[in-house]
């Protein structure tokens, strides 16, 4: 099923929407809580509410392999969602809530692998507390003001991202790609940077706080 250019208002999507496509649609005061959206595609869609203090709810929804491209999702709640394999490309996710969502497939309690694709998105002030984003594609995002406390991004591609200087040290980034990222505020004495990739020009911002001169 394919919806194009349609407007939905005040609708609770409790039916099965797996693999359904929505293109350039507008969702006003709609509720996707616990919706079955696995494999669905949203392109150029806007999700808005009458209450300016909260966004659209995808709480506890099944968004496995769901695609959001160029969508307006500011303040949306993905709390508790099952999101393994989900992708967000060029989306406005400012202030979105991803707490308790799952983007990992657990084989055992200590063995798992992660899958989520977030690229070119505005993630300012979004809440990712405790998330597992290991070895995921997370390039060219704005992370300023986001809550990254306890997040594991080990092995992830964070290249060309924009981070707040005070966020360094709140999350794990061993073996990740930090090329073309402003590393101001990152203290190499307080973080495990094993295997981290950077560009030559980034060395100065890491070493100058130690009194070293890169020439």
Predicted feature locations:
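Tandem repeat scaffolds
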Residues: 1-215
């Amino acid at each position: 099923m394919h919806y194009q250019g349609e407007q939905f208002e005040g609708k609770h999507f409790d039916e099965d929407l797996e693999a359904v496509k929505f293109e350039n649609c507008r969702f006003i005061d709609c509720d996707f809580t616990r919706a079955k959206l696995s494999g669905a595609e949203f392109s150029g869609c806007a999700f808005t509410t009458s209450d300016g203090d909260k966004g659209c709810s995808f709480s506890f929804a099944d968004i496995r392999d769901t695609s959001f491209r160029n969508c307006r999702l500011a303040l949306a709640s993905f709390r508790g969602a099952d999101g393994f394999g989900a992708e967000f490309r060029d989306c406005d996710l400012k202030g979105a809530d991803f707490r308790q969502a799952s983007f990992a497939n657990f084989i055992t309690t200590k063995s798992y692998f992660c899958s989520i694709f977030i690229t070119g998105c505005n993630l300012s002030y979004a809440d990712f507390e405790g998330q597992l984003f290991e070895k995921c594609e997370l390039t060219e995002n704005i992370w300023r003001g986001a809550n990254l406390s306890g997040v594991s991004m080990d092995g992830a591609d964070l290249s060309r991202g924009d981070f707040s200087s005070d966020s360094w040290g709140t999350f794990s980034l061993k073996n990740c790609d930090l090329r073309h990222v402003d590393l101001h505020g990152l203290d190499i004495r307080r973080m495990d940077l094993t295997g981290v990739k950077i560009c030559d020009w980034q060395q100065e911002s890491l070493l100058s706080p130690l009194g070293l001169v890169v020439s």
